[in-house]
């Protein structure tokens, strides 16, 4: 019985041969990567040369990039090269994905775009410097304060004003989906006291009398509006202006947004405006927002 069993084992063509990861065909690895998130792909690229080569496949990364990635390359990456960002030209889809996942400034540094590393969804930030703001050039009303808390290196601080109107717009080719627009605001002036960051509330006033109106509209006729009193001092809050839906691929959309408090019966002041955020609707929960 033992001899018979031994002869059967020896007759098996693959007996005694163990298959390792190096034996997995590269096209199988590529197919597997199509179902994985980018961080997992980058981790598995270290396994061996076959995994590394498969992790660089354009077929894998074309599937991970947003449908509007060609627009992003033209609008953002090529714009950076024109203003002197010294990076080599990008050809592979993996390199495009990696570059777009960084914070990318464009439009003379007044706007920023980046991809979520896992989902490939697009996020935008718009600086107050890209907006029209009442009295912004008058130092009696406004000042720009350097801050490492800002995406743009500085925040816009309102000392005091009667009529507040901050309006901005952006023309952008969004991937189809639903998006939220939020204003990043803080009541109180950031200062340093005894070497520590703190917030002065000395000039905060007028925001509890009448509500602030946040609005957005799009070139295809969508509108949204919300009103609220600003009552959270000493910390950054994302105030939700509204949502809009993009249905058509490869079709640029104008998005106009504003923040208004134009009741001239009282002054208001002590407010910091950092930026406006446009994010996929399902990601707005990552921001501490007021609705």
Swiss-Prot record:
Transmembrane feature ranges: none
Keyword Nucleus part of the UniProt annotation: yes
GO CC terms of this entry: nucleus
Main location (coarse class): nucleus
GO biological process, alphabetically ordered: protein ubiquitination
The entry's keywords: Nucleus, Ubl conjugation pathway
GO molecular function: carbohydrate binding
Subcellular location: Nucleus
Pathways involved: Protein modification; protein ubiquitination
F-box domain location: 18-64
UniProt superkingdom: Eukaryota
InterPro entries per UniProt: F-box-like_dom_sf, F-box_dom, PP2-like
Positions in coiled-coil regions: none
Function: Component of SCF(ASK-cullin-F-box) E3 ubiquitin ligase complexes, which may mediate the ubiquitination and subsequent proteasomal degradation of target proteins.
Domain description: The F-box is necessary for the interaction with ASK proteins.
Subunit structure, as described in the record: Part of a SCF (SKP1-cullin-F-box) protein ligase complex. Interacts with SKP1A/ASK1 and SPK1B/ASK2.
Protein name according to UniProt: F-box protein PP2-A14
Gene expressing this chain: PP2A14
């Amino acid at each position: 019985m033992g001899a018979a069993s031994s002869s059967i084992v020896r007759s098996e063509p693959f007996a005694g041969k163990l298959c390792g990861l190096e034996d997995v065909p590269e096209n199988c690895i590529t197919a597997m990567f199509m179902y994985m998130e980018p961080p997992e792909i980058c981790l598995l690229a270290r396994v061996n040369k076959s995994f590394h080569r498969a992790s660089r496949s354009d077929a894998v990364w074309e599937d991970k990039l947003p449908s509007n990635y060609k627009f992003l390359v033209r609008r953002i990456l090529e714009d950076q090269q024109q203003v002197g960002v010294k990076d080599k030209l990008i050809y592979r889809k993996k390199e495009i994905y990696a570059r777009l996942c960084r914070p990318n400034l464009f439009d003379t540094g007044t706007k920023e775009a980046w991809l979520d590393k896992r989902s490939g969804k697009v996020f935008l930030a718009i600086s107050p410097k890209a907006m029209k703001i009442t009295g912004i050039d008058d130092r009696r009303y406004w000042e720009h304060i350097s801050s490492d808390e800002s995406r743009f290196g500085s925040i816009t601080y309102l000392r005091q004003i009667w009529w507040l109107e901050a309006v901005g717009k952006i023309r952008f080719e969004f991937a189809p989906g639903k998006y939220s627009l939020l204003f990043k605001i803080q009541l109180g002036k950031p200062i340093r006291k005894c070497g520590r960051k703190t917030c002065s509330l000395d000039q905060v006033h007028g925001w509890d009398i009448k509500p602030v109106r946040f609005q957005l509209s799009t070139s295809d006729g969508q509108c949204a509006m919300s009103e609220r009193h600003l009552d959270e001092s000493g910390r950054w809050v994302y105030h939700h202006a509204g949502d809009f839906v993009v249905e058509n691929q490869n079709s640029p959309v104008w998005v106009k947004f504003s923040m208004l408090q134009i009741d001239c019966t009282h002054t208001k002041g002590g407010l910091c405006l950092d930026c406006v955020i446009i994010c996929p609707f399902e990601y707005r929960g990552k921001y501490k927002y007021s609705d």
